[in-house]
From Swiss-Prot:
Keyword presence, Nucleotidyltransferase: no
Species for this entry: Macrococcus caseolyticus (strain JCSC5402) (Macrococcoides caseolyticum)
Binding residues annotated for GTP, in chain numbering: 32-39, 59-63, 77-80, 144-147, 176-178
Keyword Protein biosynthesis part of the UniProt annotation: no
BP GO annotations: division septum assembly
Function noted in UniProt: Necessary for normal cell division and for the maintenance of normal septation.
GO MF term list: GTP binding; metal ion binding
GO cellular component: cytosol
Gene: engB
Full protein name: Probable GTP-binding protein EngB
Length: 195
């Protein structure tokens, strides 16, 4: 899959189904804890520095942000989960918004769940993965921030993630750093299987 980074645009920020765009394209949702690196992941994957806003403040994404990727697919950036400084009401609202999107959206082809390779998956990570499996949503798990651990320990950390999430053998697990585009073809190939 060849992406022209000059042909990427944010279509809409939505909070409810009647605001979802009608592109006819398949969608790939990006889910993960606040500050796991979703915005950096999007920017690196599409080869644009600031398409998705990067913030050191967790909980910045509060809507479903739809990005048209070169008229080939749509990335949907969903609010990060597990951020304690947001009110319980707000967290529940985000949770409902994400659940509605994932369980009702016909265009959804798969979900990329991002986890931090440096740490064991959290309870929230496990709940999200189990939720996706319950609804039989194809899932690609991306272990971000691989540049933060020694190369020799990457496989060990991936094994822990696979075990902790009790991953299906059919699901893909890829380690990743936003500092390099080397893994982009591998990730786009994994996505393409579901389009």
């Amino acid at each position: 899959m060849n992406i022209n980074p000059n042909n990427v645009e944010i279509i809409i920020s939505a909070v409810k189904p009647d605001q979802y765009p009608d592109t006819g394209l398949k969608e790939v949702a990006l889910a993960g804890r606040s500050n796991v690196g979703k915005s950096s992941f999007i920017n690196t994957m599409i080869g644009r520095k600031s398409m998705a806003r990067i913030s050191s403040k967790p909980g910045k994404t509060q809507t479903l942000n739809f990005f048209n990727i070169d008229e080939q697919l749509v990335f949907v950036d969903v609010p990060g989960y597990g951020y304690a400084k947001v009110s319980k009401t707000e967290r529940e609202r985000w949770g409902k918004m994400i659940e509605t999107y994932i369980t009702t959206r016909d265009n959804l082809a798969c979900v990329i769940q991002l986890v931090d390779i440096r740490h064991n998956p959290t309870e929230d990570d496990r709940l999200m993965y189990d939720f996706l499996k319950h609804y039989e949503i194809p899932t690609i798990v991306i272990a971000t921030k691989e540049d933060k651990i020694p190369k020799g320990k990457i496989q060990k950390h991936l094994k822990i993630i696979k075990q902790d999430l009790d991953m299906d053998s059919s699901d893909t697990l890829i380690s990743y750093t936003a500092l390099s585009k080397d893994k982009n073809p591998m990730i786009f190939n994994a996505i393409e299987k579901y389009l």
